[in-house]
């Protein structure tokens, strides 16, 4: 592994080989040696590990994953644990809430014990909603959302209908449930040195299936949520694609303003890079990064302006012709080129 002398401001505890914007991607625990060599060839130095086996959410397993990836010069930035992410028991105060919060707390402790200092959390009670897929540029499979004809999905569970959980929930209930959870989680995160970035709702609309998306579906909700948490360890995982789905009108500010605000507060921990055809309320589809309504160079430039030195990852990587690595290679190359471009514009890497 190359020397890593540069501490990251975005997530203290991590060190990088170079200052400034970092580039990573999602990695399976079952990645082959060739998969990891491919990441080396792309100069990917940060991994978002997706662990689907519940029995492997232990500090010992995390250490094993970390040691293997580091032998290829790749550091784990985040471990995904879907068992404590988008959990209706927590979001809606369903039976088993306290047990799920305790599971979340143990997850944080396991991360810290394994030398992993960041996790992404989302607070959706009924999953990510879509309408289906269509052909994008060159026939690539592209996710579509028409809010009038959509259903939710989270790790295989489908959500449909006017009330996905039996009744309509109020905004006050959602806020009370968030506050109950975050006041238990934040002190543990601080004690363990783990940083939690909260992901926007996808899609960020007022309500779906009787559940308001009033907290992480708009800018003012984010601000209030961070004030309630009142913790340096609770911040934002900014999904650019989700913010673009809502647009400036739906979210309250555009994605550039959001970056400047959260980055200026040192609350920006991680960034998901994705583009879409247009903002709601009209139906939209996901696009290649260079083919949506947002100029992604301006997004990267805003990240550079606030001296963001956390990881940017490609989100919803397109399944291109040419094999499973083609979409990843396109995405990483596009992101790395933008990083190089904005660094050249500023004359140096962030923090240099």
Located regions from the model:
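Active-site-proximal, glycine-rich beta->alpha crossover segments in alpha/beta enzymes
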Residues: 106, 110-180
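Glycine-rich, proline-tolerant flexible connector loops at the mouths of alpha/beta enzymes
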Residues: 50-64, 127-130
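A short glycine/small-residue-enriched secondary-structure motif
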Residues: 41-45, 75-91
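Non-cysteine beta-strand/loop elements that form the S-adenosyl-L-methionine
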Residues: 45, 50, 77-81, 121, ...
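Catalytic domains of carbohydrate-active enzymes, especially glycoside hydrolases
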Residues: 29-52, 68-72, 113-119
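Active-site-proximal loop/turn and secondary-structure-junction residues that shape catalytic pockets
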Residues: 29-31, 53, 82-84, 123-127, ...
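Histidine-acidic metal/acid-base catalytic patches
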Residues: 2-22, 70, 88-90, 98, ...
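Aromatic-lined substrate-binding rim segments of carbohydrate-active enzymes
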Residues: 58-73, 78-79
